[in-house]
């Protein structure tokens, strides 16, 4: 089977990672002690993608948990799923990275990285046919951002032909932990552009908006935000974990979603949105789901898709859904909003379906969009970066860890290039390509 090794780094990465394992274990009928108590054969059919079977009926996640301070690890270990993970797979330092990307990437993180790679190697050796790695981390801190990207480049060196997929929480001024988030995020994106194959952008600001506006929560906690993230992660990985036809592994997903290798940053969405603890009391229909899913308010990245165009889209419907109806609705959306889809990629909207719905709802859909509007998110980070960098604010924190200003300049220009590339493809039309084709025969005649 095509296994995936999961790595969670830093406080944020470990928190959303733990939530992910909670949801996935629940969907596959795996108890907190790792024993299978499920009822449906489909739960076991592709269980080996994320779990290692040890002994009869006992499963252990293929997860590596990393942090530069012991605090988060302790809370995962004492949390509901503490007994599920392999004890050797907790790797932590003592000092913390203090929200400093350079500490995570060059000093503290670099000291710990070899012991992490040993565990990753051990997990990779325990697979039949490894398809790739998924990393959960935030881009605003020190460990998840700095050490997370260091791990990615090291894993890339060792497994150059395996997929690398990241769930990256992008910082936002609305929900800010520290003042240097724009630095950490820009330095991280610089790495993600080169070393990741698919990055699912999750944005705290958008998650907060969903909690306020849609779920009517007056004071959302990180627990509420992580609850939303776990919906999306569960939905994206549905195709990987349950038998299905479309996007059934990371590489196929990338083939369908990434038209140009650098443009692999996806917006994610989920419908129907429900708050923690409140289940839905009305049935949803496919048209409602489709409409909700394309709604800007449902996006987990604070970019408005109406300000850009979709290069590619994938939707994963779950529950007892008629595929015919899904196809009709998706076609309908494209016909009505054709201006928002680039016309030079044919069949760029795909739908998959899985019979097992998420807990508590009859039907749900997860949305993945490669939209040029994601540049808004990068612009926002980049503007904050530039404002600070031109005054060299807080730069000494990074230079005293051995970083060079040149690295900041490079990261800044790489971010600007990325924004420009998205803009270029947003403006591209079929006419431009057609003109080019018409010019060629003219030369032959002369």
From Swiss-Prot:
GO terms for molecular function: GTP binding; GTPase activity; metal ion binding; structural constituent of cytoskeleton. The keyword tRNA processing does not apply. Its main location: cytoplasm. One of its GO terms (cellular component) is microtubule. GTP binds at residues 11, 69, 138, 142-144, 204, 226. Its cofactor is Mg(2+). Gene3D superfamilies: Helix hairpin bin, Tubulin/FtsZ, C-terminal domain, Tubulin/FtsZ, GTPase domain. Transmembrane segments: none annotated. Keywords: Cytoplasm, Cytoskeleton, GTP-binding, Magnesium, Metal-binding, Microtubule, Nucleotide-binding. SUPFAM superfamilies: Tubulin C-terminal domain-like, Tubulin nucleotide-binding domain-like. InterPro entries: Beta-tubulin_BS, Beta_tubulin, Tub_FtsZ_C, Tubulin, Tubulin/FtsZ-like_C, Tubulin/FtsZ_2-layer-sand-dom, Tubulin/FtsZ_GTPase_sf, Tubulin_C. GO terms for biological process: microtubule-based process. The keyword GTP-binding applies. It is found in: Cytoplasm, Cytoskeleton. Tubulin is the major constituent of microtubules, a cylinder consisting of laterally associated linear protofilaments composed of alpha- and beta-tubulin heterodimers. Microtubules grow by the addition of GTP-tubulin dimers to the microtubule end, where a stabilizing cap forms. Below the cap, tubulin dimers are in GDP-bound state, owing to GTPase activity of alpha-tubulin. Belongs to the tubulin family. Dimer of alpha and beta chains. A typical microtubule is a hollow water-filled tube with an outer diameter of 25 nm and an inner diameter of 15 nM. Alpha-beta heterodimers associate head-to-tail to form protofilaments running lengthwise along the microtubule wall with the beta-tubulin subunit facing the microtubule plus end conferring a structural polarity. Microtubules usually have 13 protofilaments but different protofilament numbers can be found in some organisms and specialized cells. This is Tubulin beta-1 chain. It comes from Suillus bovinus.
């Amino acid at each position: 089977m095509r296994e995936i090794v999961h790595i969670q780094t830093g406080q944020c990465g470990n928190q959303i990672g733990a939530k992910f394992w909670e949801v996935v274990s629940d969907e596959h009928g795996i108890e907190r002690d790792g024993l299978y108590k499920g009822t449906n054969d489909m739960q076991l059919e592709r269980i080996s993608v994320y779990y290692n079977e040890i002994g009869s009926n006992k499963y252990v996640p293929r997860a590596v948990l990393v942090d530069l301070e012991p605090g988060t690890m302790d809370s995962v270990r004492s949390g509901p799923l503490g007994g599920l993970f392999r004890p050797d797979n907790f790797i932590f330092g003592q000092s913390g990275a203090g929200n400093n990307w350079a500490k995570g990437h060059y000093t503290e993180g670099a000291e710990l990285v070899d012991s992490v790679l040993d565990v990753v190697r051990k997990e990779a050796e325990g697979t039949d046919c490894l398809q790739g790695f998924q990393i959960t981390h935030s881009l605003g801190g020190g460990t998840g951002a700095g050490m997370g990207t260091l791990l990615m480049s090291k894993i890339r060196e060792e497994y150059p032909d395996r997929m690398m997929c990241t769930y990256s929480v992008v910082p936002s001024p609305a929900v800010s932990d520290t003042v240097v988030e724009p630095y950490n995020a820009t330095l991280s994106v610089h790495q993600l552009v080169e070393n990741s194959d698919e990055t699912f952008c999750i944005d705290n600001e958008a998650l907060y908006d969903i909690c306020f506006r849609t779920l009517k929560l007056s004071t959302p906690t990180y627990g509420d935000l992580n609850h939303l993230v776990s919906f999306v992660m569960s939905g994206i990985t549905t195709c990987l974990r349950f038998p299905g036809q479309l996007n059934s592994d990371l590489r196929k997903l990338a083939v369908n979603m990434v038209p140009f290798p650098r443009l692999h940053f996806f917006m994610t969405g989920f419908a129907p949105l429900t708050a923690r603890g409140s289940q839905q009391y009305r049935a949803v229909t496919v048209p409602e789901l489709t409409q909700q899913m394309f709604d800007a308010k449902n996006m987990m990245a604070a970019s408005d898709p109406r300000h850009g165009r979709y290069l590619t889209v994938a939707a994963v419907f779950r529950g007892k859904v008629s595929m015919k109806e899904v196809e009709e609705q998706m076609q309908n959306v494209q016909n009505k909003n054709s201006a928002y889809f680039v016309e030079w990629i044919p069949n760029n909207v795909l739908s998959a379906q899985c019979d097992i719905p998420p807990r508590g709802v009859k039907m749900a859909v997860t949305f993945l969009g490669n939209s040029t509007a994601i540049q808004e998110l990068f612009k926002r980070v980049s503007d904050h970066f530039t404002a600070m960098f031109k005054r060299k604010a807080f730069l000494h924190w990074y230079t005293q860890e051995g970083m060079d200003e040149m690295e900041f300049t490079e990261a800044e220009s790489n971010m600007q290039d990325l924004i420009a590339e998205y803009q270029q493809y947003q403006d591209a039309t079929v006419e431009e390509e057609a003109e080019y084709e018409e010019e060629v025969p003219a030369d032959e005649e002369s």
